[in-house]
Amino acid sequence: MGPLAPILQEYFTAYAVTQRAMSGATIRAYRDTWRLFLAFLSNATQVPAHQLQLAHITPADVVAFLDHLERGRRNGVATRNLRLAAIKSVMAFHASKSPDYLEVIARINAIPVKKGPKPQMTFLTGAEAQALLDAIPTDTWTGRRDRAMFTLAIQTGLRLSEITSLQAADLHLGAAAHVACTGKGRKNRTTPLTIATTTALRTYLHERTTRPGHALFPGPRGDALSADAVQQRLKVHVTRAAASSPGLVGKHVTVHTLRHTAAMRFLEAGIDSAVIALWLGHESIATTSVYLHADMNLKRAALDRTRQPDSPAGDYHPDDPLLAWLQSL
């Protein structure tokens, strides 16, 4: 059945890059999966990683590795499923080259993803979003950069990776102002900008031209801010904003929260889910439907729109004390 080393070398140097055109982030995630998996197999079989054979991999080994990730490394369900996808991808790639191993590969590819609890989606209200922006000091270069960056994030809903990869040339602030980015799956898209965002970015861009590098939001040396740096800057400003906006106290806010915030604004305005999916760069409308479950006010509004003509608007509140007690359970 052959050694694993040449299989992995061909997969990562040729197939993933040339045939699949995977993004750098996906390749790194898959690479890290196989580094962990090989170390796990090597420890279990007492065979050095470079000497492992395809025959050393069984469905039971894969399941044991996934359980090890959850129990030993405290990884969540999402990480477990990502690691499983990386293993399946390599196995599927090699299936046509190892016909005598097809049954085992099929059993590995049949291992189901694990369902986990879906966390409550977090987003900012309009007041909280404004409090966040107002809390960012603009008496320093970094403060002005951060305000421009998070103004863009809240209005456009760009992903963190999309924000950090933006170049100054990606901004088009003339007629029909927009920002161009390369999103998930290397898909290019353009996102229109509001007048307020355009004005903020035009002011920022004028100052940005005096700085080195081409990144739209650079660090001190002109290189693009890292994802961790952006999250840390956001954390600092959220903490400051919480002093004037109690709703932010204890709320875990990330750049993805700002993406959710942009989506919820559209939903509250009655924009169709298909349009929101296009705006956010979602491949499927099903991905966007998660926002429909996020806001209780939207649910109440939907209930009011569908009530019987002779029914009053609002939620049902039982008058009977026993019913009230049962409802409170």
Positions of PLM-derived features:
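Conserved catalytic core of the tyrosine transesterase superfamily
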Residues: M1-L329
